[in-house]
A protein has these predicted regions:
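Ala/Thr-enriched low-complexity intrinsically disordered regions
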Residues: 2-8, 21, 35
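N-terminal intrinsically disordered, low-complexity tails
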Residues: 12-23
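Non-catalytic helical/linker scaffolds that mediate oligomerization, partner binding
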Residues: 36-677
Length: 677
C-alpha cells in the first residue's frame, strides 16, 4: 500500500502547531452600544442614499482610520450577535463541526452587507481587503482591525474567539473533512475525481481497473438505473481492481429522488425507413443494406445495417442469392430489394431506392431463371415491427396540456387547414405538481430546451403556453425533466423507492448522495433513516440542484453538520435551469464560498469534459471549465465511451492547475513566460 500523501497544509506548514485546546476568550470589549448604534445609523443612511447598497466608507466628517475601525467593529459585533442567536445550538451540530458552524455564521454576517467600498479603502492602505476570509472569517477581520489600531496610534487590541478557526486552521479543517468523506488525496493532486459508472462496469472488470489506474478516486453508482445485482457486480470489480492496483477508492451511491418528468407518449406507427447512401450531389454512393432475420428467433447483425426486417422463418429460409423481393411500401410506391448474402438462417439484402416498410407488408419473391427473366417463387409478409417512439412537436405560442392522468400523451390534432383541434398533451410523473404550481409561474421542459408560462391550473390539468422554442419547433419526448423554479412543491426528497434501496446503500457504500434536497427537514429525514439502519457513519453528499435548495444552503449545511462525513455537490444541470443559465456562474461561486466558510468539501459536477467522455475530443471551453474544478475538492465525470481517457486528461489538468490556484487564491509559482523573457 502506497503511503498517504502529505496534506497541502502539512507540506506548507509542517512545523505549525495543531488545533489549540479551548481557553477562555480574550476578546477585548467592543465599543459601547451607543457607538455601535451610531455606526449602524450611518450605514443605514448610506444604504438608503445608494438604493439599498450599504457602503462602509470613510466620511468627510470623520478621520478615515476612525471610520474604518468603527466599520470593522460593527461587522464584528454583528457576527457575535448572529452567533448568539442560538442558530448553531438548535441544529445540534457535532462537536467536530462547531468551529466550522461558527465560522459559517460569521461569514453570513459579513456578507449581509455590501462592503465593496470598505474593501477599496482597506486596499488603498495596503491592507487585506477581506476578499479571502472564508476559512477564518473572524480571525481575518480582527487582524485587520488591530493593524488599523496601530496605524491610528492606539494601543487597543482585539482577539478572535478561541471557538472559531484561527489562521491556517480553517484550511486544516476543510482538508480533514475532505479526507474523511473522500479518502486521502492522491500523491500529485488534492482534488479527487468521481466517475459515474455505466452498466458495463458490472461485467467489464478491465474498464473498472483502467478507471482506477488512471485516477478515479470515487466510484459513483446512480440508483436511478440498473439494480442491486448490477450494483453489487460493479463494487466487486472495484474491490478486485483495488487489490491489483494497490489503490483505494470510495463508493458513492446516488438516490434517485423525486425527479419531476414527463410521462409516456402513445407509440407512433409500426413502420421503418431505409434509404441508400448519397453524396453531396445526390448520387448513390452505396445501396442500403438490410438485415433480414427470423421474426420468431431474431439474430443481431454482425455488421452495420441500415434496417432490420423480421420475416417468418419458412419464407426466410427459402430465399437464395440474387432473389428479388418486390413490394408496395407504406406510401404506395413500388419498391424492391435483392438478396446479396446468406449468413446462417439470415439474409443480407440491398436496395437503391428509399422505402417505408410496415408490419404485414406483402413481399413477392422472384428468382432469375434465364437472362432477363425471373420466375415467381413465393409470397411472404413482414413480421412484427416495433412502433416508432413518438415525440410532441412544440412551437412558439403552442399550448401544451400537462395531465394528472397517466394516460399516454399524444401530439396536437389539426384539421386540413392546420387549425388546432386539440393541443398536445402529456402526463406528469408526480401528482404533487398539480397542487403546487400557480398560473403565471415559469416552467422548463427537457433540461431547459423548452420554456413556457403556466396559464391555467385545475386539479387534473395544467395549461402551458410555450414561450421559448427554436424556429421550427422542439421535440418533447417521454421521461424528460420538468423544472418549475418559482413553484413550491410539497415533495419529500426521500421517495418510497429511495427507502427500498437505502439498506443496500448502507451495507455497500461509503457515501450516499441525496438528490433534490430542499429544506432542513429533508436532511433530518435522511439522517433519521440512516440511524435506524445503523448507517450514522455513512458519508452524506447533498446535491444542490433546485433554486429552493440553493436558497436554503446555509441552513442545509448546519443541519448536515449533525453528521461527521459530509459534502455538497453542485449539480449544475438542473441548477442552471432552476436559477437561469445567466446566473449559473454566480450561483456556483456562492456555493463554493459558503461551503469553504463551512469547511465542507464540494463536488463540481455535470458536463465536465462531456465532449471528451462521449466523443473522444474535448471542446476548448470544457477544458477551461475542468480547470475551474481545481477550486472544488472533487470533480465528477459522467459516463461515456471515452471515460478512461477523460479521467486521465482530467487528472493531468488538475495536477497542472494545482501550483497555480488554491480555492480563491492565485499561487505565484515561477512563471514560464517570465523565465524565457
Amino acid at each position: 500500500m502506497a503511503p498517504p500523501a502529505k496534506s497541502a497544509n502539512q507540506r506548507r506548514e509542517e512545523s505549525k502547531r495543531s488545533l489549540p485546546t479551548r481557553r477562555k476568550s480574550r476578546i477585548v470589549p467592543f465599543p459601547q452600544k451607543e457607538t455601535i448604534l451610531t455606526h449602524r445609523e450611518e450605514l443605514d443612511a448610506v444604504s438608503h442614499s445608494r438604493g439599498g447598497k450599504v457602503s462602509l466608507s470613510p466620511s468627510a466628517s470623520q478621520p478615515p482610520l476612525e471610520k474604518l475601525i468603527g466599520s470593522l467593529n460593527l461587522l464584528l459585533s454583528e457576527m457575535l450577535e448572529l452567533e448568539a442567536s442560538g442558530l448553531i445550538h438548535t441544529t445540534q451540530v457535532q462537536l467536530s463541526h462547531q468551529a466550522s458552524a461558527r465560522n459559517l455564521v460569521d461569514y453570513l454576517a459579513l456578507r449581509r452587507r455590501d462592503i465593496r467600498q470598505l474593501q477599496s479603502d482597506l486596499a488603498s492602505l495596503g491592507l487585506s481587503s477581506l476578499g479571502r476570509t472564508e476559512p477564518h472569517v473572524q480571525s481575518s477581520l480582527v487582524t485587520v482591525l488591530n493593524v488599523l489600531h496601530k496605524l491610528a496610534g492606539s494601543t487597543a487590541t482585539v482577539s478572535a474567539s478561541t471557538a472559531v478557526p484561527q489562521f491556517g486552521q480553517g484550511a486544516d479543517l476543510l482538508e480533514k473533512n475532505t479526507n474523511i468523506l473522500l479518502g486521502d488525496a492522491p500523491a500529485n493532486r488534492h482534488v479527487r475525481i468521481m466517475v459515474t459508472m455505466p452498466a458495463e462496469a458490472a461485467t467489464n472488470y478491465e474498464l473498472v481497473r483502467d478507471l482506477l489506474s488512471q485516477g478515479m478516486d470515487c466510484m459513483r453508482i446512480n440508483c436511478a438505473h440498473d439494480g442491486p445485482e448490477t450494483w453489487s457486480a460493479m463494487i466487486r470489480n472495484l474491490r478486485r481492481a483495488e487489490k491489483e492496483t494497490n489503490k483505494r477508492c470510495k463508493v458513492a451511491m446516488d438516490l434517485a429522488g423525486p425527479k419531476l418528468r414527463t410521462g409516456s407518449i402513445e407509440p407512433g406507427p409500426a413502420v421503418l425507413k431505409y434509404r441508400p447512401h448519397r453524396d453531396a450531389f445526390g448520387h448513390i454512393t452505396s445501396p442500403a443494406r438490410i438485415w433480414l432475420t427470423s421474426d420468431s428467433d431474431p439474430e443481431v447483425a454482425s455488421e452495420p445495417a441500415d434496417a432490420v426486417i423480421p420475416i417468418p422463418s419458412p419464407g426466410l429460409g427459402r430465399l437464395r442469392l440474387r432473389d428479388r423481393l418486390h413490394f408496395t411500401d407504406a406510401r404506395g410506391a413500388p419498391r424492391s430489394m435483392i438478396i446479396k448474402g446468406v449468413k446462417g438462417k439470415n439474409r443480407w439484402a440491398e436496395a437503391v431506392r428509399t422505402a417505408y416498410v410496415f408490419e404485414g407488408m406483402m413481399l413477392e419473391v422472384r428468382r432469375p431463371v434465364s437472362k432477363g427473366k425471373r420466375a415467381y417463387i413465393q409470397r411472404t409478409r413482414v413480421g412484427p415491427i416495433s412502433p416508432r417512439k413518438q415525440t410532441l412537436r412544440l412551437n412558439l405560442g403552442d399550448t401544451l396540456l400537462l395531465t394528472r392522468s397517466l394516460d399516454p400523451g399524444r401530439p396536437s390534432q389539426r384539421d386540413s387547414q392546420e387549425n388546432l383541434i386539440t393541443p398536445a398533451q402529456i402526463s406528469v410523473s408526480l401528482p404533487e405538481f398539480f397542487d403546487g404550481v400557480k398560473a403565471g409561474e415559469p416552467i422548463w421542459l427537457d433540461d431547459g430546451m423548452i420554456g413556457g408560462i403556466i396559464r391555467t391550473v385545475t386539479p387534473d390539468q395544467v395549461r402551458v403556453e410555450i414561450t421559448q422554442a427554436r424556429p421550427g419547433g422542439e421535440k418533447l419526448g417521454a421521461e424528460k425533466g420538468i423544472n418549475v423554479p418559482e413553484s413550491h412543491l410539497r415533495l419529500s426528497s426521500l421517495t418510497g423507492q429511495d427507502l427500498k434501496v437505502l439498506p443496500f446503500v448502507v451495507k455497500n457504500a461509503d457515501i450516499v448522495s441525496y438528490s433534490f434536497v430542499r429544506t432542513e427537514a429533508d436532511v433530518l429525514d435522511l439522517q433519521s433513516h440512516l440511524a435506524k439502519l445503523g448507517g450514522k457513519k455513512l458519508g452524506i453528499i447533498l446535491k444542490i440542484e433546485t433554486r429552493e435548495g440553493f436558497d436554503h444552503l446555509p441552513r442545509l449545511l448546519l443541519a448536515l453538520m449533525r453528521s461527521r462525513a459530509i459534502g455538497i455537490m453542485i449539480a449544475r444541470g438542473d441548477l442552471a435551469v432552476e436559477c437561469g443559465y445567466q446566473r449559473l456562474a454566480e450561483v456556483q461561486e456562492e456555493i463554493l464560498w459558503v461551503c469553504e466558510a463551512a469547511h465542507v468539501p464540494v463536488v463540481w459536477a455535470t458536463q465536465v469534459l462531456e465532449s471528451l467522455a462521449k466523443n473522444g475530443i474535448p471542446s476548448r471551453s470544457e477544458v477551461t471549465d475542468a480547470a475551474m474544478g481545481e477550486r472544488a475538492e472533487c470533480v465528477m465525470l459522467n459516463k461515456g465511451r471515452y471515460t478512461v481517457t477523460a479521467v486521465r486528461i482530467l487528472s493531468d489538468i488538475l495536477e497542472r492547475m494545482q501550483p497555480h490556484h488554491e480555492k480563491k487564491n492565485s499561487l505565484l509559482r515561477k512563471l514560464h513566460l517570465a523565465v524565457v523573457f
